[in-house]
Amino acid sequence: MIRNTFKLVSNIAVRPAFSSTFVRQPIVASSMMVRNYGSISEKEITDRVIGVVSQYDKVSGKTVTPTTTFKELGLDSLDSADILVAVEEEFGIEIPDEEADKITSCAETISYLRKTPTAK
């Protein structure tokens, strides 16, 4: 008798939890929970790189274009390294040292970022 009563009570107590919470409610992902993994457009990359370079202290007041070299801006290798660190922070990536040594202009920075799928 006690065993049958316990079964009946436990079935009644468990049934609403499983039937309404786990079975009947559809699973819907809100758009806020979905990450868009599309690539960044070239225009956005260009604008952000120019923005990072333009904000560098030694560049203020100079015109920066996509084809501007760091040398034209009067920057040395340490300044270039500082800019590339800022670019890494801006795009959430890490540029390997051997690649960073090859980057000497905004155009090369943009080209590298276009080839980097993890840039955000």
UniProtKB/Swiss-Prot annotation:
Pfam families per UniProt: PP-binding
Organism: Dictyostelium discoideum
GO molecular function: acyl binding; acyl carrier activity
Gene Ontology CC annotations of this record: mitochondrion
Listed pathway(s): Lipid metabolism; fatty acid biosynthesis
Lineage, opening ranks: Eukaryota, Amoebozoa, Evosea, Eumycetozoa, Dictyostelia
Gene encoding the protein: ndufab1
Predominant location: mitochondrion
Post-translational modification: 4'-phosphopantetheine is transferred from CoA to a specific serine of apo-ACP by acpS. This modification is essential for activity because fatty acids are bound in thioester linkage to the sulfhydryl of the prosthetic group.
Annotated family: Belongs to the acyl carrier protein (ACP) family.
The keyword Transferase is assigned to this record: no
InterPro entries: ACP, ACP-like_sf, PP-bd_ACP, Ppantetheine_attach_site
Protein name (database record): Acyl carrier protein, mitochondrial
Record keywords, A-Z: Electron transport, Fatty acid biosynthesis, Fatty acid metabolism, Lipid biosynthesis, Lipid metabolism, Mitochondrion, Phosphopantetheine, Phosphoprotein, Respiratory chain, Transit peptide, Transport
Cited function: Carrier of the growing fatty acid chain in fatty acid biosynthesis. May be involved in the synthesis of very-long-chain fatty acids. Accessory and non-catalytic subunit of the mitochondrial membrane respiratory chain NADH dehydrogenase (Complex I), which functions in the transfer of electrons from NADH to the respiratory chain.
Domain Carrier, residue spans: 43-117
The protein's assembly and partners: Complex I is composed of about 45 different subunits.
Modified residues (O-(pantetheine 4'-phosphoryl)serine): 77
Keyword Transmembrane applies: no
Membrane-spanning intervals of the chain: none
Location in or out of the cell: Mitochondrion
